[in-house]
Structure formats: structure tokens, C-alpha cells
Amino acid sequence: MQRQENMRHICLRWLAASSLLLAAMCTSAATRPRYGGTLRISTSAVLNSIDPGEAPDSLLRRNLTRLLFDTLVVVDENGAIQPSLADSWNSSSAGQRWQFTLRHGITFSDGSALTSDVVAAALRKANPTWRVISQGDLVTIELETAVLDFPAELSLSRNAILRRGDKLLGTGPFVMSQWEPRHRLVLAARDDYRDGRVFLDGIELEMGKPQREQNITFDLGRTDVIDIAPDQARRAAGEGRRLVNSSPSELMVLWFARDAQSEVERKLREALAMSIDRPLMNRVLLQNDGEAAASLLPTWMTGYGFAFSADANQARAKQLRTEAGPARTWALGYDNDDALARVVAERILLNARDAGLSVQTTLSASADIRLIRIPLTLTNERTELSELFSAMGISPIKLSSSNVESVYSAENTFLQSRRVIPLLHLRHVSGISASVQNWSVGRDGSWDVQEVWLSGRQ
């Protein structure tokens, strides 16, 4: 009897262990990455061209550039320079001459080899002031002035390496199979990509889709990744959407069409800056999902953002307005398709009126002031400040390194001119379907699709 009871316990334990093992195997099988499937992305952004060097720059252009093309180096999440098409580099002449050694065995999507001649041609076109020399597997770049952190600049999307001809060819993990400017792009995964084939078979991108249409197709299961407007992120989270967001990495700024022509005009701009309640904008319009900004670069990048006050000072704004005397009405322009820009512009008008300033919105391209949004890059302080100046049509700063003190001084000097008034740093937010696994974005909103795979469908 005792023996039968012991056997019964042994059998029960064996069954329990077998059940646990089977469950573990099933779970492992269910979560193990698998190849196949097409990732469907919908966005409100549009592109007329996939050429990385075309203006205007945008987060969408940068993300597509990373899928189709490569740069000589990349910047990781910690701001460190990592090899990409180049596996080593060195400098001489105190940072005025740089030499890069190309990796071997890299091919374009048509199977042709990457050569130093092709690399040099791409860099010359993107940077006419550089002297670029190719020899063997070496690419040498001679600059007009020394730049100690020059490789960071080569990580920018506009310096992606491509071969131009009847079509643009790249060395990235995907190749373009269909392209309808401003509407649709279809990419296919490359089996011969140097870092190994991605799990996805392809990516389908639908452009120019309003937020409401994106939400509908997402809820119907027809889209995997959609935009979420910064001011809608809290609501989307409350509705149970799965969200992925970046650090505050898009600058919303007031940009004046010209420099202040007199001290009176500078005082009026100072009064406008003092009147705007940025913290209230962030709290009410963004529900604290962004950051009030008085600096061009975000604090997470520089560490010095707190040195610029974003608080409103209506008393000081009124005083400056009185000192300035008679003033004309400013015309404020913005992108009419940008719902957030519209409500921010309305808030600016109210704040300005409280300070005695006259501002009216306009859809004209010749506005006195424009409310614009500029995506930031994950490079370094010096490079990013130079890129911001370029995006705003302002002569780039001449800094040889990303020393924080020198970057702060350059930014502070520029902000004192009141050519621009920073308002907010925004996050890039995406809605992700349950079938998308391992989706992640960088601090600047860049997609990382190398490990992305799809569950539940092909």
C-alpha cells in the first residue's frame, strides 16, 4: 500500500514537472524572434525625395536614411562615436585633416562594392567646402578650420554614403522596392546586409495621413506603428494604447525673419519673450509630456538648460513694452496642418496681448515671425548647435570642439540677440501594435528596427 502511494506521488511530480517544462517550451516558442512579415507604418509627415541631402531635414528623412544608407560612423546612445562604414580613423594637423579606413566586403544593394571613390564623391557633394581625397581603402578629408570632434558631423544623415545614378543606391539593411513621393514607400530587407538580415521581410510606409485616419487604421489592425501628437500622448495612454517615446528632442521656437534692426526692436522682442508662459503651455497643452524651453538645446544633452529661465515675467514685459514706445503689429505664421502649433500660437497671442503687444496669426509665407519645429540629433552639443543654426538659415558657429563652456557661451550670445525665442522641447511619440516586438527608439526618436519582429501574423 505504501509502495503504491509512493509511486502515485512520483507520477504526480513527474506530470507536474512535465507540465512546467511544456509550458516553458511553449512560452519560449511564443517569444522567440522569427523571420517574416511586413511592418506597416503610418505618419502625417511627407517626403518629396529620399535623398538624404535634400531639404528640409526631418525625423522621417533621418529614419529612412538609416534604413537605406549608412554613414562612415554612428553615435550611440551615450554620445560615443562607433564604427560603421569606416572601421578606424585618425586626425592630424590639430584636427584639420582626418583619415578614415573603410571596412572590407561592404556592397551596395545592387551587389557592387563600396569604394573610397564612391565615398569621396558622396561627401564632396554634401560638403562642397571639404577637400576629400580617395586612395585605396582610405578617405582623407581636409577642412578649412580644425574640428576636434569632426567624426560626430559625419554621423549626420546628410553625410550618408550613397551612389547616384538612375536611382539612389545604399548599403543599408533595406532596399527600396516602391516609391510614390509624398504618399507611399515600400522597402524590402536585404539578405546580404553586412550585419545580418533583419527579421522583417519589409516595411510599408504611408505618408501624409492625418492623426484621425491613423487612429482608425490602427484600431482596425491595418497599421502597426503610428504617430501620436505630443499633445495627445496622455489621452492615447489613457485609452490603453501602447506608446514608445523619445527624450524631449524636437525644438519648438519662434523665429524672426530678420535680425533686430534697433534697440527698440530688440526690447519689443525681449518683451514678447518675457510675456510667454512656457511652463503653462507644457502643463496645459502637453500635459507635462514635454519641457518648457528657454534654451535651444535640451538639458539632457548639455546639462546647462537650467541656466536659462523659462518663467514668464509679465511685469517686466509690460515695462519693456512701455519703454519701447509705439510699435506695429507682428504677423505670426505657422504650419496650418500642425494642430499643436495652432494652439501654441493662440496662447502666444493671449500672452502678448496681456503685455501690451500686438500679434496676429497669418498663413502668409512672409510673416514677421514663424513658429517652427526642428528635430534634434543624437550627436554632441557643438554639432547640434551648428545644425540648428543651419536649419534656421543662420550662419553656423565656428567652434572647434564640443567643450560645454564654449557651446554655452555661443548659445547664450545668440539668444541675447532675440533672433529666436525658444518655447518647448517636444517628445516624439509613437503608438505600437501588440504584434510588434522589440520596437525601440533612440533619445532623438530614431528607429531601431534591427531586432524588430512580428508575432501573430506574417
Model-derived features: positions:
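Surface-exposed binding/hinge segments that line
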Residues: 97, 101, 124-164, 173-180
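N-terminal lobe/hinge region of extracytoplasmic solute-binding protein
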Residues: 42-93, 169
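Acidic-aromatic pocket-rim loops
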Residues: 2, 363-402
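Long beta-strand-rich cores associated with HINT superfamily self-processing modules
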Residues: 432-458
